Amino acid sequence: MPFFYVPGVGLSTLEQKLTEMITAPVEALGYELVGIEFIRGRTSTLRIYIDSEDGITVDDCADVSHQVSSVLDVEDPITVAYNLEVSSPGLDRPLFTAEHYARYTGEEVTLVLRMAVQNRRKWQGIIKAVDGEMITVAVDGKDEVFALSNIQRANLVPQF
């Protein structure tokens, strides 16, 4: 199961440490750290999402990967074997912070909840508002309110 970086919401010690270590090198290269996922498994994966006003290229990802790898090699915060992936958020951009939800107000989103609300864990609708640690999503014409701490995963729905 993936672990997501959401400032102030359920961060483990490892995720806090990774965020602290990764943010400065990413920002020093001129990119925004959108979020991180640490997916535990047979071969674990540390996935880093970056963005910039000009978009992200493969070369940008390679630069960030090289810089972050150097930091992780020295600090060695992860005790299991893992793969490092650096990518843009893509069309189905994951949302990690309240600021991300606010930035994409009016956009369609898919949410997967940690705990079911009205016997449902998966929801899809339009982001209407963000109020502190709560978001309002219009689902089938009705406003539903979700706590950010209950959102396991959120992605924008690409519009073609």
From Swiss-Prot:
Entry keyword set: Cytoplasm, Ribosome biogenesis
InterPro entries with a match to the protein in the record: Ribosome_maturation_RimP, RimP_C, RimP_C_sf, RimP_N, RimP_N_sf
Presence of keyword Cytoplasm: yes
GO cellular component: cytosol
GO BP annotations listed: ribosomal small subunit assembly; translation
Superkingdom of origin: Bacteria
Places the protein is found: Cytoplasm
Pfam families: DUF150_C, RimP_N
Entry annotated with the keyword Electron transport: no
Record-linked PANTHER family: RIBOSOME MATURATION FACTOR RIMP
HAMAP family found in the cross-reference section: RimP
Summary of the function given for this chain in its UniProt record: Required for maturation of 30S ribosomal subunits.
UniProt record similarity statement: Belongs to the RimP family.
Protein name: Ribosome maturation factor RimP
Protein species of origin: Cronobacter sakazakii (strain ATCC BAA-894) (Enterobacter sakazakii)
Gene name of the encoded protein: rimP
